[in-house]
């Protein structure tokens, strides 16, 4: 067993994926070679069994680390505001809030009244047309700020947890 934090585990996963890509590239480049009939072939240094076993070994480590992270995320609660939430529920909630924040951001940037653009169909109309918002702009702005603040507090709690909470990973 090895002790890791989520932050460290993600760095290890990045390294393992880089290593795996190295062996996948080696496999891709070493599978075949071209040689002219009248010259000595230059055979790439490639051993299927060695490369395949390295890839399988790396994949096994990745599975163990990701499983440990998933268990930690599903079973450990973090205080966020005045409630406790599991890490995985925080991640889901943050995704929901970020989508809502994008909608509210678009709404809060609208003008209360805008003139419609003239186009081919509007060219014959004498009176200009206006588009009006159908909501309270200040309320939307406040809701945007509230959601932004909620996301920030979740992110801070999550960052602290990821940097400090240690868990066991099977080696």
What are the functions of these language-model segments?
Residues 1-171:
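Structural preference for solvent-exposed beta-strand-turn elements
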